[in-house]
Amino acid sequence: MQESQDTHMSSHLDEVVAAVSVTSKNRIPNKLLQTALFQPPREKLHLCEERAKSYSSSREYKQAIQELVRCVALTRICYGDWHWKLAEAYVNLAQGYLQLKGLSLQAKQHAEKAKEILANSIESPCHNKTDIFKCSLELFYTLGRALLSLQKFKDASENLIKAERLSKEMLQCGNIVKEEWIEIQSRIKLSFAQLYQGQKRSKEAFPFYQKALEYTEITKDEKSLECVQVLRELAGVEQALGLYAAAISHFSRDRLPTPQPCPLGHKCCCPSPFLSPVLNVTWRPFYSSQVDEEEAHLIILSKDPSPEEAADSAHFIARAAAASGMHDHRDVAEKYFQESMTSIKDSEGAERAKFLSIQDEFCSFLQTTGQKERAAMILRESLEAKVGAFGDFSPEVAETYRALGRADLAQGNNSGAYAKLKKCVQIETFLYGSQDKKTLATQHTIDTLSKISEAAGKSRQSVKAKVAFCTSAPQYGMPGKGRHSVAD
């Protein structure tokens, strides 16, 4: 039995040596093999950390996660089970799962493991506590982000508050410099903004987005890609707030100095470093959501984007302009819808599906602006492409038939509407079943059209019968009088 185990162990070691000693093409020289096998753990740890950073920056996320896992194992070998360095390795792994792969639950579990290690870690009195404080700060921040992604808003808020409080204490004690504190604040403020917005509390989110943008512009530059995310989310909050045009206009007229020229050419703008009586935060013009989107778009275009990135950026502006509901913004919305679609018009696969989705939004925009015939024409032309991209029995094709049916109804073409809605309900029955709300609603419309058609048919038959009766009935003269002839 012992001999069998020894043989198995020997075989396993041979496999390990073979795996280490052979690259994808050539065998590593013996000297390098010995270096790889007998390299001290701390040197291996340092190499793994560097490789994790390299893979992350080159967007090779799977390899980056693998290196972070190795870092945890090597840190345990180097420092033991209850050293703060192991907690730091778990925090880095949690950040990797959260930021690189979007796996919030795994990130939460690793962050909680790091918290447990820090709570039980044993350090010598002479050890510099700054590194431990920084590790704790990143732990609270990462755990807060993970809980936010899991929509556990109360727990997320508690951890973000701890991170913010600790960062202020570290700044006051000289553990971090002001520039480092501002960078930390930009992340924390953005997280708080997203936390409030995730609960549909746009009013509370608004000032945090403004602070996040301010700090991000200081640390990353105004034209950085990091600013794009904040600008877009800020624009979304401004739209959700309803814009408050009347209140802002009144405040502008009574309180503010001469307005500065609006970058879009409007005459409704005024300087921003003032407090709005509506929101009690730094005021931004009512069209500012669109301004933010255009700023973000210019940043994207300056970075030599791919067609997909350019399309996404233009699409954001089109949505912002369309959502404003203002007549002056219609041309802007159409311009950026067209720009977005042009960027990916000839794409295939997933991007082709994105093009068709944007095209549908554009058609909805055209319908709301009274261009219903143009919208219907585009939808009719898109049917073949949608069948090719999504299949005959797909939600996208069903919705297109529904929209075309409604367009025919609006034009009084009941027979055309009936035919298109009939196709729509067939697809919906296949996708969702005959008792689904969508299917039942479409079927109800079809039944109503059928009744109208039947009623119209009966009415026509009745009219024809009356006409036939009147023309075939004999013409009798008055009693005692003969008919008058032409001669008479």
Swiss-Prot record:
Major localisation: other
TPR repeat intervals: 45-78, 137-170, 186-219, 228-261, 398-431
SUPFAM superfamilies xrefs: TPR-like (SSF48452)
Coiled coil: none
Subcellular locations according to the entry: Cell projection, Cilium
One annotated Gene Ontology cellular component of this protein: cilium
Domain of life: Eukaryota
InterPro entries: TPR-like_helical_dom_sf, TPR_rpt, TTC23/TTC23L
Keywords, alphabetical: Cell projection, Repeat, TPR repeat
A biological process from GO: positive regulation of smoothened signaling pathway
Pfam families according to UniProt: TPR_8
Assembly and binders: Associated with the EvC complex composed of EFCAB7, IQCE, EVC2 and EVC.
Function per UniProt: Participates positively in the ciliary Hedgehog (Hh) signaling.
Protein name as catalogued: Tetratricopeptide repeat protein 23
Organism: Mus musculus (Mouse)
